[in-house]
């Protein structure tokens, strides 16, 4: 499993804020780990909730958990990582694996957050440039949340 250091924790917290699961407005009993897309909560962490939610006539989703993981991706990563449940620890493990597969972990570790966000934009619909037709946050807002969560951003001399 991929290690969680302070930089990675801050990036995960930023993602949860961006995805709307742990933003101070969405109801949650567990920092967003219990949120189904659309706002409903779940309590059974033995497996992904697998609830198909119609968000609008053109958009349906099975997104669930802190990082709004789709059930089809949960099935693949559960097997790949040997996960036993959909617990917070398992949700973090999947998110970190997805970030790793995009080559963004070293960027996060050294503070190149804008580049890491760009690398991960095809995974999370709320990131700038995702192109899923959903609301996308601005990079500056995401970087501010990353810093607020305790992350350090590498300053680039211009």
Curated annotation (Swiss-Prot):
GO terms for cellular component: host cell cytoplasm. One of its GO terms (molecular function) is lysozyme activity. InterPro entries: Endolysin_lambda_type (IPR034691), Lysozyme-like_dom_sf (IPR023346). Inactivated by zinc. Its EC number is 4.2.2.n2. CDD domains: lambda_lys-like (cd00736). It catalyses: Endolytic cleavage of the (1->4)-beta-glycosidic linkage between N-acetylmuramic acid (MurNAc) and N-acetylglucosamine (GlcNAc) residues in peptidoglycan with concomitant formation of a 1,6-anhydrobond in the MurNAc residue. Its main location: host cell. Optimum pH is 6.6. GO terms for biological process: defense response to bacterium; peptidoglycan catabolic process; viral release from host cell by cytolysis. It is found in: Host cytoplasm. Gene3D superfamilies: 1.10.530.10. Keywords: Antimicrobial, Bacteriolytic enzyme, Cytolysis, Host cell lysis by virus, Host cytoplasm, Lyase, Viral release from host cell. The keyword Lyase applies. Monomer. Belongs to the glycosyl hydrolase 24 family. Endolysin with transglycosylase activity that degrades host peptidoglycans and participates with the holin and spanin proteins in the sequential events which lead to the programmed host cell lysis releasing the mature viral particles. Once the holin has permeabilized the host cell membrane, the endolysin can reach the periplasm and break down the peptidoglycan layer. This is Endolysin. It comes from Escherichia phage lambda (Bacteriophage lambda).
């Amino acid at each position: 499993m991929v290690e969680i250091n302070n930089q990675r924790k801050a990036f995960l917290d930023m993602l949860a804020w961006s995805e709307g699961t742990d933003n101070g407005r969405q109801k949650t009993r567990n920092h967003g780990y219990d949120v189904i897309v659309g706002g409903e909560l779940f309590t059974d962490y033995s497996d992904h909730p697998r609830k198909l939610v119609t968000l609008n006539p053109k958009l349906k989703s099975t997104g669930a958990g802190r990082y709004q993981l789709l059930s089809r991706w949960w099935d693949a990563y559960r097997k790949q990582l040997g996960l036993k449940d959909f617990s917070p620890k398992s949700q973090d493990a999947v998110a970190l694996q997805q970030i790793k597969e995009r080559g963004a972990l070293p960027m996060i570790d050294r503070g190149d957050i804008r580049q890491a966000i760009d690398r991960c934009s095809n995974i999370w619909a709320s990131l700038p440039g995702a192109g899923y037709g959903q609301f996308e946050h601005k990079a500056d807002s995401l970087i501010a949340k990353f810093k607020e969560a305790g992350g350090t951003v590498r300053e680039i001399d211009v």
